[in-house]
Design a protein with these regions (language model features):
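ATP-binding glycine-rich loop module of kinase domains
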Residues: 12-51
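Short beta-strand micro-motifs within the conserved protein kinase catalytic domain, predominantly
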Residues: 63-76
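Conserved short submotifs of the Hanks-type protein kinase catalytic core
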Residues: 73-87
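AlphaC helix of the protein kinase catalytic domain
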Residues: 87-97
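Activation segment signature within eukaryotic-like protein kinase domains
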Residues: 105-106
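Catalytic-loop of the protein kinase fold
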Residues: 113, 117-133
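Conserved activation segment of eukaryotic-like protein kinases, specifically the C-terminal portion
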Residues: 157-172
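Conserved HRD-motif arginine in the catalytic loop of eukaryotic-like protein kinases
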Residues: 219
Length: 315
């Protein structure tokens, strides 16, 4: 028997549990010859960019142990790392993702997607059930059955094969135009719209909404743009928090340097009124001493007139 036939390769592993079976593939949890857990995938398709994943290992996708492609029989056999953890879908259903953890996952996933797109690969089936959260909290993207190399000829051709999952796949993935990295951006937005809580900050909602734009030109053009937008949103949040802290501090400084005069009590008002009356009484005598009164002026005038008359008689 040819050592590279599908049957021979499959016999090198002990099947434990069927994980998934469809028209596109069959996936088994297996033991290898050393007794280690692994995932065996028989994909009824060829030309997938899985060799690029094998040659460029990353924590964002499973490590590929073995890859065999038979173009005549039109199948690809993949033995890959078994990822210990729970799917993002399970976390969403259990409602065990806090808002801060959701944002952290969003950022980490964008970093991983940036690495994937740097290889020229688009996944085309990003959804919560295809994201496994490891025990250390990091996300891993699985199921590359629909993956392909991104086309550099944007918008001039359309995908002839309808792939992906309804509700997560963008419009262009259903024959409107060719798919590219922005198609993964769309699915990413739909996914994390389900992860992040409804009361998330406005700027975070705005980022997710832009990811999901109908027109690819209106979306973020790559994962790096999303990371910059998330960093900006965090900066605005920090500055807003500092402003809220600064307002009470500024008010305190104002009251210390420029204290407001207290409203006088009734007793203080009475004392102030009494003091004013006393001052008025002191001013009145002083006014009398300052010059002759009207009666004194009249008497002086009369004496002056009488004296003048006496002088005239003598003369």
């Amino acid at each position: 028997m040819d050592p590279l036939t599908l049957e021979y390769l499959q016999e090198q592993y002990i099947k434990i549990q069927l994980l998934k079976k469809s028209e596109k593939s069959e996936v088994w949890l297996v033991y290898d010859t050393d007794g280690n857990l692994a995932v065996m995938k028989t994909i009824y398709n060829t030309g997938l960019p899985i060799k690029l994943l094998k040659d460029n290992p990353s924590r964002f996708w499973p490590k590929i142990h073995l890859l065999h492609e038979d173009k005549d029989q039109k199948y690809t056999l993949v033995i890959e790392e078994f990822i210990q953890g729970k799917t993002l879908e399970a976390f969403i259903n259990d409602r065990k993702i806090t808002p801060s953890k959701g944002v952290t996952l969003f950022k980490e996933f964008c970093r991983g997607l940036k690495d994937l797109h740097a290889l020229g690969i688009i996944h085309r089936d990003i959804k919560p059930s295809n994201i496994v959260i490891k025990e250390d909290g990091s996300p891993v993207l699985v199921d590359f059955d629909s993956a392909r190399l991104a086309s550099s000829d944007r918008g001039k051709t359309s995908d002839t094969v309808l792939l992906g999952t309804k509700g997560y796949a963008p419009p262009e993935q259903f024959g409107y135009a060719t798919t590219d990295v922005r198609s993964d951006i769309y699915a990413l937005g739909v996914t994390f719209d389900k992860v992040l809580p409804a009361d998330s900050p406005f700027m975070l909602k705005k980022i997710v909404r832009k990811c999901r734009a109908f027109d690819p030109d209106n979306r973020y053009q790559n994962a790096d743009e999303i990371l910059r937008a998330l960093s900006y949103a965090r900066l605005i949040k920090i500055l807003g928090g500092l402003l809220l802290l600064a307002i009470p501090a500024l008010l305190l400084i104002k009251f210390v340097l420029f204290p407001m005069s207290a409203k006088p009590t009734e007793e203080q008002k009475h004392e102030q009124k009494y003091s004013t009356q006393q001052n008025e009484e002191k001013v009145q005598p002083a006014a009398k001493e300052s010059g002759p009164t009207k009666e004194e002026k009249n008497q002086t005038s009369a004496e002056t007139t009488h004296s003048t008359q006496q002088d005239e008689k003598k003369s």
